[in-house]
Amino acid sequence: MQITWLGHSCVLLSGTKKVLVDPFIEGGSVIDTDPDIVAVTHGHEDHMGETVALGKKTVAINEIAKYLKTKGIPAEGMNIGGTINLDGVTFTMTPALHSAWIEEAGIGCNGGAAAGFVIGMDGVKVYHAGDTALFSDMKLVGELYHPDVALLPIGGRFTMGISEAMMAANFVGAKMVIPIHYNTWEKIRVDPAPFKEAIERTTDMKVKILQPGESVEIMPSA
């Protein structure tokens, strides 16, 4: 599997299928990624992004799925703790501690709960934590699903920051950690280097700091 960080929380997983998570990038477009499946962690506009414009099969919590269906999107609703298989790709929805309002025309509507995903494809499991605070049940993500890669927000203010993300990485126990949701705007500007240094100095985990548009190849676990 190839993992491409497009910026903010937007990640493209490429293998047998192309899965685009949280299709938003600041000042740009993700339309040309042409994914097979879109996954949305919660209703905020910096995560819903171009979901409607893409018009693809979309996985989201039930409330968002119902909203997307009113826009003509072939959405697959699910809920936290559930797993679905779409075209050979598995999506397990995990908890996240965050708000989840769907922002539309300055009014908005109920977006259910914020969530994360463990996505399985081609023998690789990727945990996208979504926007979240640190919580102890992240340990269960590691114990139940054994992800190979953890995508963790580190920007602070609206999510956990570096120190909490370090603890989250230890809870999840993935072999590789990729920081997300940082440096998009000044309010979430952080240097990811100390995060990488501390984790690699104290654990066997590797931290891959990607630039927007940069990719990393992940091989299936033996």
Model-predicted regions and their roles:
Residues M1-T33, G77-E143, P212-A222:
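Core dinuclear metal-dependent hydrolase active-site scaffold
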Residues L20-D22, P35-H44, T58-I61, Y127-T132, ...:
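Active-site neighborhood of phospho(di)ester-bond hydrolases with catalytic His/Asp-centered motifs
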